[in-house]
Regions:
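Helix-loop module immediately N-terminal to the HCX5R catalytic loop
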Residues: 40-70
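Surface cap/lid and interfacial helix-loop subdomains adjacent to catalytic sites
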Residues: 57-68, 90-242, 247-252, 256, ...
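Gly/Ala-rich beta-loop-alpha elbow adjacent to hydrolase catalytic centers
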Residues: 75-84
Length: 261
């Protein structure tokens, strides 16, 4: 347990990432994820077993020893969000009292689908900027991926996204002027800093992603990952592009939750 970014305490459980033939993550693990995705349309099976067991063991220990009945927020990304969906579907179904204390689950960088929500009626997707007990998700892409309708391992068919600047579910455009600041590396020191990089946001509803049109001075995705994520996926920037807006949104949802207690 640790304190960070103005929050009282953060649990950051460690888990074993996707393995294949004894090699961890890297291109081998990603190829395995891609194979599972092509066979099933989801990558859940790639994360079953040890990763899921690691997470549930950590969650059990946290709620039994540290939580003391307090409300909480879930934040995850990519593989973590895929596992979080499994946890929310299974563990939270077995422990319904936790749903009442969950302020929100930011499970970003892996698609949430209507089929998933229908199969898990105890879960609901966010509809605005301050509803609580909700799931929040998006995947960020550039024009090239969208124009080519490129395969992206984390963008599932029928994915639902919310706009991280205006917190709407429609395709209302949010210009970069609504972005409160992105988290980027300082060009000289390499240290993280908040800067305006021109990251706007608009939902592309038929693909279920957030389109960001900024003129960014870095590659969207490494060359060896383009086969899996597409030519212009901003997967690694799902949080950082909209960093200060997310921080503000967390505060609004906490305030709304506490106001209803």
């Amino acid at each position: 347990m640790r304190k960070i970014n103005g929050f009282r305490a953060i649990l950051s459980p460690q888990f074993r990432l996707v393995r294949i033939q004894g090699r961890i993550q890297g291109q081998a693990g990603l190829r395995f994820v891609e194979e599972v995705w092509k066979e099933t349309g989801r990558v859940d099976d790639a994360f079953s077993g040890m990763p899921y067991d690691d997470i549930t063991a950590a969650i059990d220990y946290y709620f039994e020893n540290y939580n003391d009945g307090r409300p909480f927020i879930i934040a995850a990304h990519s593989q973590g969000s895929a596992i979080a969906q499994i946890v929310l579907a299974n563990y939270f179904k077995e422990h319904p009292e936790l749903n009442e204390r969950m302020i929100a689950a930011y499970i970003i960088g892996y698609g949430v689908t209507p089929e998933y929500l229908e199969a898990n009626p105890h879960l609901k997707f966010a509809t605005g900027e301050d509803d609580t007990g909700v799931l929040i998700s998006w995947n960020t892409e550039g024009k090239k991926s969208i124009e080519e309708n490129a395969d992206n391992v984390v963008v599932l068919p029928n994915s639902i996204s919310i706009n991280p600047l205006n917190w709407k579910l429609d395709d209302t455009y949010a210009p970069a002027s609504e972005n409160l600041g992105s988290l980027v590396a300082n060009e000289k020191t390499g240290e993280p800093e908040i800067r305006d990089i021109g990251a706007d946001a608009q939902l592309v509803l038929d693909r279920g992603v957030v389109l960001s049109n900024g003129e960014f001075d870095f590659d969207a995705v490494p060359e060896f990952l383009k086969k899996i994520f597409g030519p212009e996926s901003f997967h690694g920037n799902d949080y950082t592009f909209f960093y200060n807006n997310i921080k503000e949104n967390v505060a609004k949802r906490v305030e709304a939750y506490l106001a209803n207690q």
